Amino acid sequence: MITAIIFGLLSAVLWGTSDFLSRETSKSIGHYLTTGYVQFIGFIVPISIALFYHEQIPTFDLPLLLLNCLLGIFLFFSFIFLYRGLTEGAMSIVAPVTSGSAPAFAVILFVIILGQTLTKIEAYAIAGVIIGVTLSGVRFAQLKKDILRTGFPRSNAANKKASQAEMEHEDHEKTRRIVKGLDLSLLCSASTAVVYLGLGILIPRLGWLFPAIILKGAGALVAFAFLLLARKKFKIPDTRTFLLLFLMGVLDVGGLLVFNYGISIAGNLLPLVVTFSGLSGLVILICAYLVYHERLERIQAVGIFLVITAAAILLYFQ
């Protein structure tokens, strides 16, 4: 059990750090290109590992190969939904909902489809971690701003009343951001849960390395094909942005490889690996606190305490 938790936590640290760095690259080259570059770099790294260590290619039958490629498509969409949600929706809604619901969806799929079983203690502790992760991302002060914020400019609001049409438009924009943020975060979580489920099927049959190669390769192909078909502007990043992208790609695929290896040795503890990998949202919160000096709200401290308590319960009753 300790091993499953450790690998889940390691993947959370790597994924959370990579996602935290995406703010700057997304501003520089956009979310779509950031996704494409991160997936491509994530494809190169495991291939290099396989060549360096002379890893033997496992036997792929057609259904497993198609499943692996399909997961790459879901991986691409999970990134796009997340980045669009953070940009076009309310961040104070997208971040906690995504961090909390993705592991929840995945655990449900593991139990229903893969037949994974949980003891009552494990089920309660996993629920505690998921709730804690969700609470740790909630910032009521920012949430209030997001709900009250409107997308319609009111330049002369101090001198004259806004027309009824303007007020209706403002209400529509406010509602749109809240609903769109929630919709996209749930779509991201559902896509991520499907990827987790697919990896739970592939890794026991193909090992932990090669599914990551195909997953990232398919994700990169889909990303750049989308950019081409959608006629998005292709931009070569400057040196600083490229270095950030390279670091993000290495951290992201590092998290995937650690996650995959955790799955390969977890056995019936697969839900624990997935649940604790969901702490990537908490890692982003800690990075924001250290770099931007964002103070924790009381409810966030409660969420962190709940996560630590749930983890301690799991370790105590192992």
Region annotations inferred by a language model:
Residues 16, 20, 47, 72-77, ...:
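Hydrophobic/small/kink-forming positions within alpha-helical transmembrane segments
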Residues 13, 40-47, 123-133, 190, ...:
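Hydrophobic alpha-helical transmembrane segments of multipass integral membrane proteins
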Residues 1-13, 22-33, 37-73, 77-89, ...:
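Membrane-interface interhelical linkers
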Residues 62, 98, 115-135, 139-150, ...:
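Loop-to-transmembrane alpha-helix entry segments
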Residues 70-75, 83-134, 210-218, 268-290:
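Specific alpha-helical transmembrane segments that line the substrate/conduction pathway
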Residues 254, 259-318:
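C-terminal appended segment following the main domain
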Residues 46-56, 106-118, 189-204, 251-268, ...:
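Hydrophobic alpha-helical transmembrane segments in multi-pass integral membrane proteins
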